[in-house]
C-alpha cells in the first residue's frame, strides 16, 4: 500500500468513519449534536460549532494549498466563525466540514510517496507528510474536545 493511501485512511478514520483509536470520529460526534448544543458555551471552552469551523478552516485551507501551491490561510482567522443562529446554519457548517474532510483525504491519497517528502509550500513549513500528520493529530486533539464538551452538555 502506498504511504499516501495509508495516511488518507488515517484521515478518514479520525474525520469520517473510524473507531480504532478513539472509538469514535468527528462525523459521528457532530451528527449527535443539535445546533443549540453546538453553540452552547461551557465556561471558557470553545463551542462545538467553533471547533468544527476551526477544523474546517484548516482542512479547506490546506486542501487549497495542495491544489494551488499557495497558502492563503492565517492562524489568526481560524476561529472567525460567522454566527450559527439556527439548524440550517449548523447543518451547512457540518456539511461543509464533512465534504472538505473527504476531499482532503482524497487529495492526500493522490499524492505520490515522493511528493510526501517534498516541502509544503515553503521549507519553513516542513514536508507535505509532516503537515498531513499534523492535521491528523490536530483533528484527534479537537475530536477529544468535541467529545468531552458533548458529554458536558448532553442534557441541553
Predicted regions: what they are:
Residues 2-5, 11-30, 35-80, 121-156:
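Short, contiguous alpha-helical
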Amino acid at each position: 500500500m502506498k504511504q499516501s493511501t495509508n495516511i488518507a485512511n488515517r484521515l478518514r478514520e479520525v474525520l469520517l468513519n473510524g473507531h480504532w483509536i478513539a472509538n469514535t470520529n468527528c462525523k459521528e460526534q457532530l451528527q449527535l449534536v443539535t445546533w443549540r448544543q453546538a453553540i452552547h458555551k461551557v465556561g471558557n471552552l470553545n463551542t462545538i460549532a467553533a471547533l468544527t469551523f476551526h477544523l474546517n478552516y484548516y482542512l479547506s485551507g490546506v486542501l487549497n494549498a495542495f491544489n494551488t501551491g499557495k497558502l492563503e490561510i492565517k492562524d489568526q482567522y481560524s476561529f472567525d466563525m460567522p454566527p450559527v443562529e439556527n439548524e440550517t446554519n449548523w447543518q451547512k457548517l457540518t456539511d461543509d466540514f464533512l465534504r472538505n474532510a473527504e476531499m482532503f483525504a482524497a487529495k492526500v491519497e493522490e499524492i505520490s510517496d515522493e511528493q510526501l517528502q517534498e516541502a509544503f509550500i515553503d521549507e519553513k513549513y516542513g514536508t507535505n507528510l509532516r503537515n498531513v500528520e499534523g492535521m491528523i493529530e490536530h483533528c484527534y486533539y479537537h475530536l477529544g474536545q468535541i467529545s468531552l464538551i458533548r458529554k458536558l452538555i448532553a442534557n441541553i
